[in-house]
């Protein structure tokens, strides 16, 4: 099995619900290590840059508005097959379709306020981690 890193964001809705610790526990119980972490209130410019891949999509403005509506907690996770493992923990994008026991099924309210973001591939994980954490601030353990 490959040791990978993935980026995870606990979005403003989940931060406001004070479930950060519960989400971290799920990461750690699944064998993922938190190798970098920080809380940040994204600027509009940073949110637009981070989600630039979606700029032409009809939901882009609403996504950016939501992501700047409150602080987020950003973490780099490391472990065997971290990307797939993290995506399994998150559940389907639409919490109504997410399996019971997933983060989105348990903590998300809607397809827009869906509690968490996760990288979808090794290439995007590398870009997303670098966006929030200069390499010197990520610590394998």
Curated annotation (Swiss-Prot):
It is an enzyme of class 2 (transferase). InterPro entries: NDK-like_dom (IPR034907), NDK-like_dom_sf (IPR036850), Nucleoside_diP_kinase (IPR001564), Nucleoside_diP_kinase_AS (IPR023005). The active site is at 117 (pros-phosphohistidine intermediate). One of its GO terms (biological process) is CTP biosynthetic process. The keyword Aminoacyl-tRNA synthetase does not apply. The gene is ndk. One of its GO terms (molecular function) is ATP binding. This is Nucleoside diphosphate kinase. CDD domains: NDPk_I. It comes from Paraburkholderia xenovorans (strain LB400). It catalyses: a 2'-deoxyribonucleoside 5'-diphosphate + ATP = a 2'-deoxyribonucleoside 5'-triphosphate + ADP; a ribonucleoside 5'-diphosphate + ATP = a ribonucleoside 5'-triphosphate + ADP. The keyword Kinase applies. Keywords: ATP-binding, Cytoplasm, Kinase, Magnesium, Metal-binding, Nucleotide metabolism, Nucleotide-binding, Phosphoprotein, Transferase.
């Amino acid at each position: 099995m490959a040791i990978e890193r993935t980026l995870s964001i606990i979005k403003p809705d989940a931060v406001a619900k004070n479930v950060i610790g519960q989400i971290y526990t799920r990461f750690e119980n699944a064998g993922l290590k938190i190798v970098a972490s920080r809380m940040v209130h994204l600027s509009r410019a940073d949110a637009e840059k981070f989600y630039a891949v979606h700029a032409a999509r009809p939901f882009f403005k609403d996504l950016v508005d939501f992501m700047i509506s409150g602080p987020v907690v950003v973490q780099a996770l490391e472990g065997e097959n971290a990307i797939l493992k993290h995506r399994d923990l998150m559940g389907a994008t639409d919490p109504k379709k997410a399996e019971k026991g997933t983060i989105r099924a348990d903590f998300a309210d809607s397809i827009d306020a869906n509690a968490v973001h996760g990288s979808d591939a090794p290439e995007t994980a590398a870009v997303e981690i670098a966006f929030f954490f200069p390499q010197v601030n990520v610590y394998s353990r």
